Amino acid sequence: MSAPAQPPAEGTEGAAPGGGPPGPPPNMTSNRRLQQTQAQVEEVVDIMRVNVDKVLERDQKLSELDDRADALQAGASQFESSAAKLKRKYWWKNCKMMIMLGAICAIIVVVIVIYFFT
């Protein structure tokens, strides 16, 4: 920061030290600084608006993603239960086939034994 402006000596209002051309009055300098600060504030406000918009968009996308994840989880649970039912169904079907195969083998063995021992 620059040093604070000192009031001009009497009779030298607006005059530069050393008798040169007059400089801008202190009021103009403060107005210029005020305008620069106001421009910076407006720039920061614009940036913050953009950031808030981005945050809101991100929040919306996250909400949509959360909804999709919930739907996917529900679908996965349904798939898991139907897969377990299907597995159990085919296990019983396999057991029935093994029992039938064993019965057929037993009948064949009985027929062979009866045929050769009679």
From Swiss-Prot:
PROSITE patterns per record: SYNAPTOBREVIN, V_SNARE
Reported modifications of this chain: (Microbial infection) Targeted and hydrolyzed by C.botulinum neurotoxin type X (BoNT/X) which hydrolyzes the 68-Arg-|-Ala-69 bond and probably inhibits neurotransmitter release. It remains unknown whether BoNT/X is ever produced, or what organisms it targets.
GO biological process, one term: SNARE complex assembly
Side Vesicular, residues: 117-118
Chain ranges on the Cytoplasmic side, renumbered to this chain: 1-96
Superkingdom of the source species: Eukaryota
One GO cellular component term noted in the UniProt record for this chain: glutamatergic synapse
Ranges of biased composition (kind: Low complexity): 1-15
Keyword terms of this UniProt record: Coiled coil, Cytoplasmic vesicle, Disease variant, Membrane, Phosphoprotein, Synapse, Synaptosome, Transmembrane, Transmembrane helix
SUPFAM superfamilies, per database record: SNARE fusion complex
In-chain residues carrying the UniProt-annotated modification Phosphoserine: S63
Site ((Microbial infection) Cleavage): R68, A69
PANTHER family registered for this protein in UniProt: SYNAPTOBREVIN FAMILY MEMBER
Family: Belongs to the synaptobrevin family.
Summary of the function given for this chain in its UniProt record: Involved in the targeting and/or fusion of transport vesicles to their target membrane.
Disease involvement: Defects in Vamp1 are the cause of lethal-wasting (lew) phenotype, a mice mutant strain. The lew mutant phenotype is inherited in an autosomal recessive manner and manifests with neurological signs. Lew animals are characterized by a general lack of movement and wasting, eventually leading to death before weaning. The affected animals die near postnatal day 15 (P15). By P10, the mutants are noticeably immobile and lay on their side. Before this stage, mutants can be identified by a failure to attempt to right themselves.
Name this polypeptide is given: Vesicle-associated membrane protein 1
Protein species of origin: Mus musculus (Mouse)
Species lineage: Eukaryota, Metazoa, Chordata, Craniata, Vertebrata
